[in-house]
Amino acid sequence: MVEALIPAPVELVWQRSQDPVLHVAWDIRFTRIAYLTGKDERGYHLMDYRTAVAFGVEVKGVGRYLHTTPLRHSTFEFDSSDWKSIIRDGRGIWLYEVRPGGTWFKTIYDYQHRRGVLGRLLDWLFFRRLLQLATEWSFETLRLWCAGDERAGARRRSRLRFLVFFAGRLLGLPPAPGAARSWLGRGRESQLEDQPAAVEVSRRR
């Protein structure tokens, strides 16, 4: 779970998180997001996700929006047939809530790994924590951008900056006051603590 209080109108946060081009500008987890033509058998729009890892290696995946209530929440699922991806499939939800200080933006997600016991070990030792903190880093980039820092996206695309942040968080350094924050699992959620059930609801749609 990752959340941030963004000092900006919900309309701006919605636009920059829902538009694929703007999404890539702040989310370090992806290098390309694009709508695909056509829909799946359930009528959901398909999206192509790409992540450049290193030395020309790219991981590919497909996303689907399951349900969207403008300016409030959107649920999605994702999967990858790319053998390089630890993630096999997963689901999540983005939540938007207007607060006195701006917009409370939150995501809850989970996924299934591939490669059996080896995948489970890699996920437990490294990947799940990496994905959690990459999401936290990205939410903080969005928060800074929406707060008026127009260079936040370009500055924070640096892998070196992220690795320094990642190492610091692994060593126990807390997020800066007011910055995006994250947790693994449930039990420490904040004011939107009743919302994790929304992910379960989306699975039954």
What do these predicted regions represent?
Residues R29-T31, E41-H45, V59-G63, P70-F76, ...:
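A generic structural signal for short beta-strands and their flanking turns/coil linkers
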Residues D79-E136:
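Beta-strand/loop substructures that line and gate deep hydrophobic ligand-binding cavities in soluble
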Residues Y111-A179:
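A conserved amphipathic terminal alpha-helix motif
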Residues M1-G43, R157, R161-R205:
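Hydrophobic ligand-binding cavity/cleft-lining segments
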Residues P7-E11, G38-R42, L66-H73, L95-W104, ...:
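A short, structured loop/turn motif at beta-sheet edges
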Residues V2-A4, I33-L36, T51, K60-H67, ...:
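Hydrophobic/aromatic beta-strand elements that line small-molecule binding cavities or substrate pockets
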Residues L12-S17, H23, M47, Y65, ...:
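Hydrophobic pocket/interface hotspot
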Residues H45-A54, F76-W83:
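Short beta-strand segments that buttress and anchor functional surface loops
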